[in-house]
Curated annotation (Swiss-Prot):
It is found in: Cytoplasm. GO terms for molecular function: ATP binding; homoserine kinase activity. Disulfide bonds: none annotated. Pathway: Amino-acid biosynthesis; L-threonine biosynthesis; L-threonine from L-aspartate: step 4/5. Keywords: Amino-acid biosynthesis, ATP-binding, Cytoplasm, Kinase, Nucleotide-binding, Threonine biosynthesis, Transferase. It comes from Pyrobaculum calidifontis (strain DSM 21063 / JCM 11548 / VA1). Belongs to the GHMP kinase family. Homoserine kinase subfamily. One of its GO terms (cellular component) is cytoplasm. GO terms for biological process: threonine biosynthetic process. This is Homoserine kinase.
Length: 296
């Protein structure tokens, strides 16, 4: 079972918006037997026993009132610690594979909730935006966390994803949250509300112009930009090459540019050039909106 990479926040949609795209994917294989326990093997790396997949399974078992002996193998092709939802996609792919293999019926929201709670292992607190995108696909808006409610849209949008090859920042998510402002002026709050509304309206109508308006952000991105390698040059080059919008992907260091067909190649080349001029190796891909692991 595969779950796609995701880009959360998209500018003004901090902690509530994510889009699934086909730039990368995580794949999980499971074997289900009688008994109770979860054994997880990750191809190519070892996150330790306290990982998002194991924790997500514990939450799912509690929610369903069941327990099974599950052997999981995760093949995660999403670059790790790059702001592309790698940990959440691993958990979603594993839970979706288990539900299919065990012949269970589970509400998609339960999978999103269990995987989101599993994010505590990677980020220190629950996060539902990335996992909702990986599970449901399309563009998602987390409208409530208690109770959990997620709205999915299926917009036809095109992105260019830039992934710089830089050393991971220890406890990156915690750091990137610690730099955020604790208060904002009321005028800024109103402007941010308008931009989030533009994001949602753009998703609902597949209107890239509205989505681009929502990708402009005066609260989170200015605080995080100094910690994102090559951000200023990448943003400038992408917009000059015809990108409609530009944002940090999740907590970075990856970035995502909204493009149209006409400018996708030019923006991809511009991002690659920006990273090269910064002395950074990077992978830059054109990506479409993807379906989620649950196929809903």
């Amino acid at each position: 079972m595969r779950a796609p990479s995701t880009s959360a926040n998209l500018g003004a949609g901090f902690d509530v918006v994510a889009v699934a795209h086909d730039a990368y994917f995580a794949e999980a294989y499971v074997a289900v037997e009688q008994g109770c326990g979860v054994a997880v093997k990750f191809k190519g790396y070892d996150p330790g026993e306290n990982n998002t997949v194991s924790l997500a399974f514990r939450h799912l078992f509690n929610m369903l009132g069941i327990c099974r002996q599950v052997e999981v193998v995760v093949d995660n092709r999403i670059p790790l610690a790059r702001g592309l939802g790698s940990s959440g996609a691993s958990a979603v792919a594993a839970l979706a594979a288990f539900i299919r293999e065990a012949g269970l019926k589970a509400e998609p929201k339960l999978v999103v909730e269990a995987a989101g709670l599993g994010e505590v292992a990677a980020a220190g607190s629950p996060h539902f935006d990335n996992v909702a995108g990986a599970a449901l696909g399309g563009a998602v808006v987390v409208v409530s966390t208690s109770p959990l409610e997620v709205v999915k849209f299926s917009p036809k949008l095109l992105f260019v994803v830039g992934v710089p090859d830089v050393p991971p920042i220890p406890e990156k998510t915690r750091l990137m949250r610690s730099v955020l402002p604790r208060e904002v002026p009321f005028k800024t709050y109103v402007a941010q509300l308008a931009r989030v509304s533009a994001l949602v309206a753009g998703f609902a109508t597949s209107n890239p112009r509205l989505v681009a308006l929502g990708m402009s952000d005066d609260v989170v991105e200015p605080a995080r930009a100094p910690y994102v390698h090559g951000y200023a040059r990448a943003r400038r080059y992408a917009l000059e090459a015809g990108a409609l919008g530009f944002a940090i992907s999740g907590a970075g260091p990856s970035v995502v540019a909204l493009v149209d067909d006409k400018h996708s190649d030019a923006v991809r080349a511009a991002l690659a050039r920006a990273y090269a001029e910064e002395g950074l190796r990077a992978e830059v891909k054109v990506a479409q909106v993807a379906e989620g692991a649950l196929g809903v």
